[in-house]
């Protein structure tokens, strides 16, 4: 097994017993692939497939004018290179986007020589037209919109197609099941079919008024005869003078009650009247050769005629199809000489007369009348002209412009109606409508099953690409309308395509979607995990989806098909539970947008290496074993019965029936849930909290890897993009805190390309949640790297692994009530060592605008401020970087012109004498808000085009250019060094014709000569060999070309920086100041483990008072043991035991290093540690240096991986504890025989506690619910407009609500005065509170309570009900 550069440094010991057959796929694949397919930027225009932007253009074009003589055709589109890169867009507040330019042709046909069949081209104009800007996806799968990072969440919506369901008996009081069907297109009108309680079948379009379904059937060209022929089988009768002969069909008779004596040919009574006809009776009739049965007259009465009956002589219709037979009608038929009669066969059980009843309720006569009825329903009040009626009906279901079933919809439709072919037209056909009605009638007859709408085979995912394409289509559709109207003018006027196309509608549609759609969300950037999870989220909400209020329990519930596709654990608590889900670890989307999950093929009980991805629909056909099924050494399933899933049910089956097997035990959960060790031992509710709270962990100053992990930490850190990985292999040439320079391997460098990769690290960058994004290099000069190796850690990562919290020594015991109700007791040492100190970065913005009274100005010259208050501002009025600021300090000086005030003559005189202008402006400087303090870490100044830059802005630009020049110099240095190395190899030992320093002709060039000559003069050497000379010339040209390209790059950068900035309307200058705030852990901060065990810090206790162990080690955290049993999250206890072993093993390795043990001894110990259980590690492949470096990294604790559902057993934990704490160490630490508990001592008294305590290491996180952000006190603040009561909440500087229950409490205590002031002067007694303020100012303490405003509001509300109420003052 080959280890990457970073993995070698610290190998995580895994307890997983199952070999990994499939590595975890790239976690942002879904987002990236979807958007790549949408843009198709890397494909040549001719090779683009019809999807994404290409499909949108092909759908909108060609546009033909109303007269048909002008046409606009689409040829291809191109994407321009974005003007600014991602970082520049973030700092400047721009959108990272690319301009779309479409090449279109305007074709004008010749009116005179064109005919309706063939048109003659008069002229063709081709031009590239700007078609708006499309936001580009960053490497991390997010978008930068107006300077902020956003994520487009994928939407889980009901797939297009046809669905059959029933109301579960809820609609009608009798509990009768009312069946319905719905045809849902991707775009267009919905078509519903539904039964009413009287068994009449109706249809409705777009949920409008319902109409009998036979109207629709007539509208598609069926007459009553063909309708009945499609839905019924017929009974045949031959009329006699009295009664009739009925054709005998055995299966129709069986189970019926005979209404008359049934006789065979010979006249023998086989079934007596009122007896049920059984199989024996029908067999007897068949054996006697009976083909017809005599039936009495009344048996015919009430039957329904199947076809029109026409008098052969007169041509008159005697009976219409669907007429009921009566005695009178039978008489008529006999008189007309009709002998053969066909009637509908119906029964109560499985052949209902539903369509026949519906036909009777339908009064339309023919196809046109039916279409008119539909027109009236769709357009009530409009006159139904023939053209309008036909056009509307065509538009509803048959026009590809207005109706699109989509590939998915057609595939699902065909599959549901039982067709083998998955392709077909994208519009409805008459056969489709008929097929749906047939299946619905079959369902009502008791045949077939209704669909489960929560099945993931009926719900598909709409990704970023698809959502963006839909928006682009809407924009193009708006353009199409406008262009169509203007195309006619192109014949008379010399117009070009760009005169006709206005790209604003496209830009507006995309802007609205990316900026304001419910699915475009502000990226959760608290830590790397929250970023990944946000991008892998699947939401059922959003446009075209569900709403929180309407979503029932079934939609939110875990469904059997979620297995391996959607995580059953990770979902928000609260109103969105179950509506927002997370994609499972190995899941992916297929071409139709259905979620697939991988399985291993099993052939004859033997596991193969073939991996198939199955969607929820396909999975139902197979028997699938779990990943933990027992296998022998050859990979064959053992045991008589194997636990498996078949059709969504858990079953035990024989090994020979298994067709597939899960690829990994972790395949059912999401990334966040798979990071919880011992997840299998936690209750589901707590696991949900644990998975969710990891996303809220604040990145701390020094991240520390978790002792107990699951093995997914590395994958999630690398895929999140927070760490820096090597793009190509090579050698580290230079490292400092801000950049890493790598000289690329020759094999990986492209011909004629700079073989240098420069990685500029992010330093103290603000995230969306104000946390700190900061990268630290983890490589040294000379390190050899391979592609994909981690070279720098980011926020919350430690040597390339996700590290969300800190490992804390935890003791489970009560401590003086300070850990009552999940409170957490923490040692002062944790705070002193800055273990949970985090940096938060706040962005403060000030803008200088152009006002009516004149321009605002950013300046140091501010009225009424002392020099002391201005001493940290530079001459431009902007604070220095590095200044430490307190609440109220000025960050940026700004003055605003004041309105002219009328001056007294004396003031005018003084003003004339002293030239006093200061009173014309007022101070509107940017100051540090209350409750925040910190260090200024960055300042950015943006100036509008045409306004002179101040010194500070110029200095910022110069610094940026200096940094850029440094990068280019580094690249040039390496390129030149590389080139001169190659020249030296090329010339050494070659014969020269002459050269610098009077090199004689025929002399051999050696290294000594080359060292003596200045390197740049090597090009003047004239080698005798022409081949060598040409190579030397090409190297020289390549170097000059590189130098020239670098100069161009520098110029471009300078141009970008010196051009004016795009600022909002009316803004002349904008300054952004970034403050770094250090937040130490304090009481009130929320902390949590990974098992849903959360709590608030109640007290920070001096180290000496904390409980300590026999060897004097004090605990870091004391948790309440009562938090475990009722919560049923036992995983935390197992984590603590294994963490305790991890620490002990690290200490043993540390002791060995201190004792300077031989490498062989270290290898032997590591082999015992890594390879006695779980996954075997290839330690023999590591060099001695690697082993020593790894040992040094392990001294703080050996990291373990206990994969989800395949983790460490109790036995494994015990083995590790024994290895970590041999008897002598265990005794010194006061551990029990099992090493899971220790004897602790009270830090305050030194007394031994009564019994042993569970002690160990737990990975504890500090969550983003910090007391500093929540603490708030109101003095005098804003009031609500209507009730005049103080507002609520910190953001509004609101008060604390003294509610109903609090009033009861004061009433109970009889505190009448307190109650009075609470309800009046402290709340909404306007006069009263003003008087209180006045009296406090005067130093008095009198209260005169008046009428609360809310009472007046109540009086007004009662009056609004028409009740006259007034307050009579006595």
From Swiss-Prot:
UniProtKB keywords: DNA-directed RNA polymerase, Nucleotidyltransferase, Transcription, Transferase
GO CC, alphabetical: DNA-directed RNA polymerase complex
EC number from the UniProt entry: 2.7.7.6
Listed PROSITE patterns: RNA_POL_BETA
Catalytic function, reaction form: RNA(n) + a ribonucleoside 5'-triphosphate = RNA(n+1) + diphosphate
Cleaved signal peptide residues: none
GO BP, sorted A to Z: DNA-templated transcription
Enzyme class: transferase
InterPro entries, per the entry: DNA-dir_RNA_pol_bsu_ext_1_sf, DNA-dir_RNA_pol_bsu_external_1, DNA-dir_RNA_pol_su2, DNA-dir_RNAP_su2_dom, DNA-dir_RNAP_su2_hyb_sf, RNA_pol_bsu_bac, RNA_pol_bsu_CS, RNA_pol_bsu_protrusion
GO molecular function: DNA binding; DNA-directed RNA polymerase activity; ribonucleoside binding
Record text on subunit structure and interactions: The RNAP catalytic core consists of 2 alpha, 1 beta, 1 beta' and 1 omega subunit. When a sigma factor is associated with the core the holoenzyme is formed, which can initiate transcription.
Family: Belongs to the RNA polymerase beta chain family.
Function comment: DNA-dependent RNA polymerase catalyzes the transcription of DNA into RNA using the four ribonucleoside triphosphates as substrates.
NCBIfam families assigned to the protein according to its UniProt record, in alphabetical order: PRK00405.1 (NF001616), rpoB (TIGR02013)
HAMAP family: RNApol_bact_RpoB (MF_01321)
PANTHER family: DNA-DIRECTED RNA POLYMERASE I SUBUNIT 2 (PTHR20856)
Protein name: DNA-directed RNA polymerase subunit beta
Organism field: Polaromonas sp. (strain JS666 / ATCC BAA-500)
Organism taxonomic ancestry: Bacteria, Pseudomonadati, Pseudomonadota, Betaproteobacteria, Burkholderiales
């Amino acid at each position: 097994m080959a280890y990457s550069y970073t993995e070698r440094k610290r190998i995580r010991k895994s307890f997983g017993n199952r070999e990994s057959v499939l590595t975890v796929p790239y976690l942002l694949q879904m987002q990236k692939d979807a958007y790549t397919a949408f843009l198709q930027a890397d494909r040549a225009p001719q090779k683009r497939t019809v999807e994404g932007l290409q499909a949108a253009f092909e759908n909108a074009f060609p546009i033909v004018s109303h007269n048909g003589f002008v046409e606009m055709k689409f040829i291809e589109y191109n994407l321009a290179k974005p003007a600014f890169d991602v970082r520049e867009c973030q700092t400047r507040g721009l959108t990272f986007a690319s301009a779309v330019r479409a090449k279109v042709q305007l074709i004008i046909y010749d009116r005179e020589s064109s005919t309706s069949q063939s048109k003659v081209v008069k002229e063709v104009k081709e031009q590239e037209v700007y078609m708006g800007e499309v936001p580009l996806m960053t490497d991390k799968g997010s978008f930068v919109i107006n300077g902020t990072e956003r994520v487009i969440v994928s939407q889980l919506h009901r797939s297009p197609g046809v669905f059959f369901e029933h109301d579960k008996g809820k609609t009608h009081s009798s509990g009768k099941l009312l069946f319905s069907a719905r045809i849902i297109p991707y775009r267009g009108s919905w078509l519903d079919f539904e039964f009413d309680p009287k068994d009449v079948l109706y249809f409705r379009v777009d949920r409008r008024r319902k109409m009998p379904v036979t109207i629709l059937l007539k509208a598609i060209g069926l007459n009553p005869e063909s309708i009945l022929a499609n839905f019924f089988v017929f009974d045949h009768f031959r009329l006699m003078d009295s009664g009739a002969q009925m054709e005998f069909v055995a299966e129709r008779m069986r189970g019926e009650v005979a209404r008359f004596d049934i006789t065979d040919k010979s006249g023998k009574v086989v079934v007596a009247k009122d007896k049920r006809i059984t199989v024996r009776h029908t067999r007897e009739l068949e054996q006697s050769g009976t083909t017809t049965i005599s039936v009495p007259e009344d048996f015919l009465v009430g039957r329904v005629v199947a076809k029109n009956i026409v008098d052969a002589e007169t041509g008159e219709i005697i009976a219409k199809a669907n007429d009921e037979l009566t005695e009178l009608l039978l008489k008529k038929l006999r008189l007309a000489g009709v002998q053969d009669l066909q009637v509908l066969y119906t029964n109560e059980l499985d052949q209902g007369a539903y369509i026949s009843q519906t036909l009777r309720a339908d009064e339309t006569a023919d196809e046109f009348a039916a279409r008119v009825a539909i027109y009236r329903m769709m357009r009530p009040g409009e006159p139904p002209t023939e053209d309008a009626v036909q056009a509307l009906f065509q538009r509803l279901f048959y026009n590809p412009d207005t109706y699109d079933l989509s590939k998915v919809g057609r595939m699902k439709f065909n599959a549901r109606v039982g067709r083998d072919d998955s392709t077909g037209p994208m519009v409805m056909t008459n056969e489709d409508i008929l097929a749906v009605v047939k299946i619905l009638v079959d369902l009502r007859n008791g045949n077939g099953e209704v669909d489960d709408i929560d099945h993931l085979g009926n719900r598909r995912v709409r990704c970023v690409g698809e959502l963006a394409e839909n928006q682009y289509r809407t924009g193009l559709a708006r353009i199409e309308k406008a262009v169509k109207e203007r195309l006619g003018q192109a014949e008379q006027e010399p117009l070009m395509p760009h005169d006709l196309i206005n790209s604003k509608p496209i830009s507006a549609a995309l802007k609205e979607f990316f900026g304001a759609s419910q699915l475009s969300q502000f990226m959760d950037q608290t830590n790397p995990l929250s970023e990944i999870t946000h991008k892998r989220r699947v939401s059922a909400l959003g446009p075209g989806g569900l709403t929180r209020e309407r979503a029932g329990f079934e939609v939110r519930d875990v469904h059997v098909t979620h297995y391996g596709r959607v995580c059953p654990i990770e979902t928000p608590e609260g109103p969105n539970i179950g509506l927002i889900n997370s994609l499972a670890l190995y899941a992916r989307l297929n071409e139709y947008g259905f979620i697939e999950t991988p399985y291993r093929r099993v052939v004859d009980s033997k596991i193969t290496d073939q991996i198939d991805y199955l969607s929820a629909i396909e999975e139902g056909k197979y028997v699938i074993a779990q990943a933990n099924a027992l296998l022998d050494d050859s990979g064959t399933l053992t045991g008589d019965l194997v636990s498996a899933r078949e059709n969504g049910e858990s079953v035990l089956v024989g090994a020979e029936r298994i067709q597939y097997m899960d690829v990994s035990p972790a395949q059912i959960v999401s990334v966040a849930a798979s990071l919880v060790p011992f997840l299998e031992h936690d209750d589901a509710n707590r696991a949900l909290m644990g998975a969710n709270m990891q996303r809220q962990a604040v990145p701390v100053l020094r991240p520390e890897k978790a002792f107990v992990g699951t093995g997914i930490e590395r994958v999630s850190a690398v895929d999140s993009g927070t760490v820096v990985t090597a793009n190509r292999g090579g050698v580290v040439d230079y490292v400092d805190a801000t950049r890493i320079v790598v000289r690329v391997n020759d094999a990986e460098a492209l011909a004629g390309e700079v073989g240098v990769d420069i990685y500029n690290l992010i330093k103290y960058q603000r995230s969306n949640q104000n946390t700190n994004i900061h990268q630290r290099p983890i490589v040294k000069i000379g390190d050899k790297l391979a592609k994909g190796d981690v070279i720098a850690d980011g926020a919350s990562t430690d040597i390339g692994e996700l590290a969300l919290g800190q490992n804390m020594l935890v003791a489970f015991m009560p401590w003086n009530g300070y850990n009552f109700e999940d409170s957490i007791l923490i040692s002062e040492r944790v705070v002193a060592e800055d273990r949970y100190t985090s940096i938060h970065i706040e962005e403060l913005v000030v803008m200088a605008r152009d006002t009516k009274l004149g321009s605002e100005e950013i300046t140091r010259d501010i009225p009424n401020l002392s020099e002391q208050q201005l001493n940290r501002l530079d001459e431009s009025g902007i604070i220095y970087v590095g200044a430490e600021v307190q609440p109220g300090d000025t960050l940026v000086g700004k003055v605003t012109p004041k309105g002219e005030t009328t001056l007294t003559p004396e003031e005018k005189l003084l003003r004339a004498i002293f030239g006093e202008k200061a009173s014309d402006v007022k101070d509107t400087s940017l100051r540090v808000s209350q409750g925040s303090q910190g260090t200024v870490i960055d300042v950015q100044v943006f100036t509008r085009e045409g306004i002179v830059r101040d010194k500070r802005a110029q200095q910022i630009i110069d610094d940026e250019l200096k940094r850029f020049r440094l990068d280019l110099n580094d690249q040039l240095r390496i390129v030149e060094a590389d080139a001169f190395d190659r020249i030296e190899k090329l010339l050494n030992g070659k014969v020269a014709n002459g050269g610098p320093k009077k090199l004689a002709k025929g002399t051999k060039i050696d290294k000594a000569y080359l060292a003596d000559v200045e390197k740049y003069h090597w090009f003047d050497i004239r080698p005798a060999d022409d081949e060598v000379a040409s190579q030397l010339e090409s190297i020289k040209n390549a170097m000059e070309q590189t130098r020239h390209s670098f100069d161009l790059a520098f110029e471009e950068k300078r141009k970008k920086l010196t051009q004016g900035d795009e600022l909002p309307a009316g803004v002349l200058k904008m300054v952004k100041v970034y403050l770094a705030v250090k937040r130490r852990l304090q009481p009130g901060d929320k902390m949590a483990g990974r098992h849903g065990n959360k709590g608030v810090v109640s007290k920070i206790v001096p180290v000496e008072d904390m409980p300590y162990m026999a060897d004097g080690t004090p605990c870091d955290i004391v948790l309440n043991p009562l938090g475990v049993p009722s919560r049923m999250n036992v995983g935390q206890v197992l984590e603590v035991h294994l963490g305790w072993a991890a620490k002990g093993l690290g200490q043993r390795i540390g002791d060995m290093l201190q004792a300077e043990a031989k490498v062989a001894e270290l290898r032997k110990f590591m082999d015992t540690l890594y390879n006695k259980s779980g996954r075997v590690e290839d330690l023999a492949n590591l060099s001695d240096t690697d082993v020593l470096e790894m040992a040094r990294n392990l001294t703080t604790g050996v990291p373990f991986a206990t994969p989800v559902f395949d983790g460490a057993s109790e036995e494994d934990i015990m083995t590790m504890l024994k290895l970590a704490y041999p008897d002598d160490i265990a005794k010194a630490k006061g551990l029990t025989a099992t090493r899971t508990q220790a004897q602790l001592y009270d830090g305050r008294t030194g007394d031994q506690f009564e019994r042993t305590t569970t002690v160990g290491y737990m990975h504890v996180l500090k969550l983003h619910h910090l007391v500093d952000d929540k603490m708030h006190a109101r003095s005098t603040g804003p009031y609500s407009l209507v009730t005049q009561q103080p507002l609520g909440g910190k953001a509004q500087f609101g008060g604390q609500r003294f509610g109903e229950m609090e009033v009861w409490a004061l009433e109970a205590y009889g505190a009448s005065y307190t109650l009075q002031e609470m309800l009046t002067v402290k709340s909404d007694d306007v006069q009263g509170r003003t008087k209180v303020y006045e009296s406090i100012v005067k130093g008095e303490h009198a209260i005169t309570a008046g009428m609360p405003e809310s009472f007046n509001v109540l009086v007004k509300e009662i009056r609004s009900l028409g009740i006259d109420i007034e307050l009579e003052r006595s």
